[in-house]
């Protein structure tokens, strides 16, 4: 069997598994966010933090809850990293001395679900920081994204109310009822597949292929690896991330990790359909996501298997930066999944992808990561795209646009348009400033188009809360740590505030009955329109920069 055939089978089994779990997991999440029953552990947490689980919040109060929780999380994680040398389970290594700028960058990175890492995990973060700091944020940052998505769905589903639910209840339920149970099962499977789970610091001795002994730090890897993928976080315990055999030992654990990356994102549209009382609407959103996912993955595999470039042509495969235990096709599927979501984990070196393969990873992030996108953020991003699509369709036929019985008035379209202006503004401004500063240009390992691609990739990844990188960029500097930290913060919280404002505006409306002129939003035509609007918006925004970077490199 050729590697191409094996890769296609790998992808087909993955898609089939996602289809199988779409309805049961989506229905389960629907019940989690709509039930009135609280678990005993949840009631205890509510008492400890002083929350009335039956009270609801306006969009402003919900947004303040998100911002307050995230701000406290950033401060806690920032301090934890700086004092880790005085805590148990720290690394006895000079490299563990975090600079304030790196601690800031890392704290913002994990709280915003980005997991950009300007450091080597196994030599910088002690086990206590990994567990009590980074792993905890992997859970709660994903739960924040799901909570915001559910709040927007409630905005569509509710009529003439200013309330969107309770952020603290949604946060706790998402963590305890969805992320934690799946993570427990996934961690056991990873350990069974060979991932490590221990508290060793520097005494994990392995034998290399050459027969010599090598000491590699151990740690609680499997428990962090599973939520890293499930919560679309992406930060690796090791610098090599999911290419490291202690994190991702075999081809089937590689498949499992890709499945974990995609499973919640592709199941949330079912939750959306159930909550608005029309499952067909959920299928339409899932179809847009699936179409873009398959299109992107197909192009990624094509570009990687075409042997484009001098070295791939000479050796017969684009194997630079690729683990032999995975191969080119499986690594291509992983690269597409990790950049179509907000994960950013890698099982190969993205800087070593073919020029056009690297362009696909950037384009995936520039789509807004909506196919299926980050945990929660993918759904609310796609719903904002649906709002823009019905607005465009309404202009074409001269009718006031409507979506799910809600009129898309000037306020709603301004909020939706602002949502999609935030990220390009951050990406293009940050890239332009970095390229204008000689000191920051010196951080590029390559000149010419690929050097530009490294910087563009960094700001694209940070602003879209992805966290992957073209590793040729030396990003652990005062300027990059600060600038990318700001890009991550603004790229996360400005869109969230705009989404919640949109949800509040929609929730206050009544319901407009369908008429003969209402655009059907559950049919294939609408699926095609949303996909088309997504591609056009991205192409008009980023094509000039892509032409100067990866496209120019590919033509050369």
From Swiss-Prot:
Keyword Ion transport appears in the UniProt entry: yes
GO cellular component, one term: plasma membrane
Membrane-related topology note: Multi-pass membrane protein
Domain of life: Bacteria
Claim: Transmembrane helix is one of the keywords in the record: yes
Protein name: Potassium-transporting ATPase potassium-binding subunit
Family matches, as InterPro entries: KdpA
Family, per entry: Belongs to the KdpA family.
Complex formation: The system is composed of three essential subunits: KdpA, KdpB and KdpC.
Location(s), subcellular: Cell membrane
């Amino acid at each position: 069997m050729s590697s191409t055939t094996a890769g296609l089978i790998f992808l087909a089994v993955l898609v089939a598994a996602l289809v199988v779990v779409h309805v049961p997991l989506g229905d389960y999440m629907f019940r989690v966010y709509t039930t009135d029953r609280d678990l005993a552990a949840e009631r205890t947490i509510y008492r400890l933090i002083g929350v009335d689980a039956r009270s609801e919040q306006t969009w402003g109060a919900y947004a303040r809850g998100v911002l307050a929780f995230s701000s406290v999380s950033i401060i806690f994680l920032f301090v934890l990293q700086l004092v880790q040398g005085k805590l148990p389970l720290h690394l006895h290594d000079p490299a563990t001395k975090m600079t304030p700028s790196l601690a800031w960058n890392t704290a913002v990175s994990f709280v915003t679900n980005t997991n950009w890492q300007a450091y080597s995990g196994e030599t910088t973060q002690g086990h206590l920081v990994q567990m009590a700091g980074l792993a905890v944020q992997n859970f709660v940052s994903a739960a924040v994204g799901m909570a915001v998505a559910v709040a927007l769905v409630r905005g569509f589903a509710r009529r003439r109310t200013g309330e969107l639910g309770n952020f603290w209840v949604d946060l706790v339920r998402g963590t305890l009822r969805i992320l934690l149970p799946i993570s427990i099962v996934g961690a056991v499977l990873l350990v069974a597949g060979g991932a490590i789970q221990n508290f060793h610091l520097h005494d994990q001795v392995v034998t290399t292929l050459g027969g010599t002994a090598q000491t590699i730090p151990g740690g609680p890897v499997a428990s962090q690896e599973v939520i890293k993928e499930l919560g679309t976080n992406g930060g690796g315990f090791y610098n090599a991330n999911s290419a490291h055999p202690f994190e991702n030992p075999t081809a089937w654990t590689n498949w499992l990790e890709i499945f974990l990356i995609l499973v919640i994102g592709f199941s949330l549209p079912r939750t959306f359909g159930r909550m608005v009382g029309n499952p067909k609407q959920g299928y339409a959103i899932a179809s847009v996501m699936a179409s873009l996912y398959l299109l992107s993955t197909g192009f990624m595999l094509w570009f990687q298997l075409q042997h484009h470039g001098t070295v791939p042509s000479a050796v017969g495969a684009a194997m630079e930066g690729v683990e032999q235990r995975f191969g080119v096709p499986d690594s291509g599927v992983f690269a597409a999944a990790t950049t179509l979501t907000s994960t950013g984990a890698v099982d190969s070196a993205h800087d070593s992808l073919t020029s056009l393969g690297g362009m696909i990873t950037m384009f995936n992030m520039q789509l807004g990561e909506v196919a299926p996108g980050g945990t929660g953020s993918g759904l609310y991003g796609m719903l904002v795209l649906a709002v823009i699509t019905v607005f465009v369709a309404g202009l074409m036929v001269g009718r006031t646009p409507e979506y799910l019985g809600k009129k898309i008035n000037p306020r709603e379209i301004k909020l939706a348009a602002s949502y999609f202006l935030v990220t390009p503004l951050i990406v293009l401004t940050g890239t332009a400033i970095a390229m204008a500063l000689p000191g920051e240009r010196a951080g590029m390992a390559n000149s010419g188009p690929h050097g530009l691609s490294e910087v563009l990739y960094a700001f694209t990844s940070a602003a879209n809360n992805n966290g992957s990188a073209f590793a040729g960029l030396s990003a652990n500097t005062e300027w990059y740590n600060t600038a990318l930290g700001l890009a991550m913060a603004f790229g996360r919280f400005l869109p969230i505030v705009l989404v919640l404002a949109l949800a509040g505006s929609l929730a206050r409306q009544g319901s407009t009955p369908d008429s003969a002129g209402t655009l059907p939003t559950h049919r294939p035509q609408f699926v095609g329109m949303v996909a088309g609007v997504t591609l056009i918006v991205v192409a008009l925004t980023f094509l000039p920069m892509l032409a100067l970077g990866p496209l120019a490199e590919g033509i050369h």
